[in-house]
Amino acid sequence: MELAQIVERLKKNEVVAYPTEAVFGLGCNPNSKSAVEKLLILKQRPVEKGLILVAHKLDLLLPFIDESRLKQSHWQLLTQQYDCPTTWVVPAKLSVPKFITGQFDSVAVRLCTHPAVAQLCEQTGFALTSTSANLSGLPPCKTAQQVRSQFGEFFPVLDMAVGNAVNPSEIRDIFSRQIFRRG
């Protein structure tokens, strides 16, 4: 599908697939409970796990982050470029719904450098949820065709290539720097 069609689907609170730095992600409007519920059902993902949010600029992630708990050094970590894509677990605002945070009082966020994410966020005006595009037990999709094979020929997928990263993003705690998933 073309970019404009994917943007329309996102604005209608539908779930789409889009390329990221290493694999295709399944995404939707994180402000829509119905969209996130569709995503969780499709992915067969428990709500307790929480979701990653991605955007091309920090402004779109700020509504989810409890800024009062972060120091300048944390902001530097969050905005710095890394050799591999890095998702940071940060304190969530109290207003962030549990369908985003899961069982946690934190939220996982990533500044994504992939042009598809930048274009989608720019045109929708919101961050995207990001969970790897794959059915339970299958490897994450690295091409639009793999997405169609797993989710059906008519699943809305942005037909662009993934980035050059080898693995999905590393996930780290902003305070302790603990690695939850290696990149």
Swiss-Prot record:
Q: Which reaction does it catalyse?
A: L-threonine + hydrogencarbonate + ATP = L-threonylcarbamoyladenylate + diphosphate + H2O
For whether the record's keyword set contains tRNA processing, the answer is: yes
Give the UniProt subcellular location, in the record's own words.
Cytoplasm
Query: Does the record bear Metal-binding in its keywords?
Result: no
SUPFAM superfamilies assigned to the protein according to its UniProt record, in alphabetical order:
YrdC/RibB (SSF55821)
Q: Which UniProt keywords apply?
A: ATP-binding, Cytoplasm, Nucleotide-binding, Nucleotidyltransferase, Transferase, tRNA processing
The EC number on file is 2.7.7.87
Q: Name one GO biological process term.
A: tRNA threonylcarbamoyladenosine modification
Pinpoint the YrdC-like domain residues. Answer: 1-183
An example GO CC term for this entry is: cytoplasm
**Record GO terms (molecular function):** ATP binding; double-stranded RNA binding; L-threonylcarbamoyladenylate synthase; tRNA binding
| HAMAP family, A to Z | TsaC
Q: Which PANTHER family match?
A: SUA5 (PTHR17490), THREONYLCARBAMOYL-AMP SYNTHASE (PTHR17490:SF18)
User: What's the stated role of this polypeptide?
Assistant: Required for the formation of a threonylcarbamoyl group on adenosine at position 37 (t(6)A37) in tRNAs that read codons beginning with adenine. Catalyzes the conversion of L-threonine, HCO(3)(-)/CO(2) and ATP to give threonylcarbamoyl-AMP (TC-AMP) as the acyladenylate intermediate, with the release of diphosphate.
Q: Would you identify the family this protein belongs to, as annotated?
A: Belongs to the SUA5 family. TsaC subfamily.
Name the UniProt record assigns to this protein: Threonylcarbamoyl-AMP synthase
